[in-house]
Swiss-Prot record:
GO terms for molecular function: structural constituent of ribosome. This is Large ribosomal subunit protein mL41. PANTHER family: LARGE RIBOSOMAL SUBUNIT PROTEIN ML41 (PTHR21338:SF0), MITOCHONDRIAL RIBOSOMAL PROTEIN L41 (PTHR21338). Residues 136-166 are annotated as: Disordered. It comes from the Eukaryota. The gene is mRpL41. It comes from Drosophila melanogaster. Belongs to the mitochondrion-specific ribosomal protein mL41 family. InterPro entries: Ribosomal_mL41. Keywords: Mitochondrion, Ribonucleoprotein, Ribosomal protein, Transit peptide. One of its GO terms (biological process) is mitochondrial translation. The keyword Ribonucleoprotein applies.
Amino acid sequence: MNNCIKVVPIALRCQQRTISTSSVLEGKRNFRKFNAYNKRGTRVVKEAQKTLANPPVAIHKRGVRDTGILVDGQYVEIPEKIPDIIVPDLTGCKLKPYVSYKAPDVVQSEFTSLDLFNAVYSQKIIEDFKAGKLQKDGSAKEPSVNEQLTPEEALQRARKTGSDIF
């Protein structure tokens, strides 16, 4: 009889309703907050991941890209897929790596075609006009290298690696 009396309060405590104010993600049985990549599955599934070229459950690589491909079961590394870190030479650079929070905000307008024209051609046109080196149609008698470019050549030069178009 004494045992029954002890069991009843325990049963009543289990039936109480509670309100949880914490997030569902903080729960005891929530495994979403743990990264368990490549840990789940049977031995058969893990062996299939290792041996098959296209396994039913892909191996999670945690964001690292392959630097090659599988050809006839052999891994062939492709040099173009290996990332290169290009570090510019900053000797003689007057810019400092740290910008103070007290520095004023710099607002720059959008770079337009007029700005590009003024940066590249305007000075040469003004000098040619003052020196009288313009023809009757307004073109230069002695054109510069940039003025001699055709539209196709200018587009090709702008798309070339190392240009500051992007």
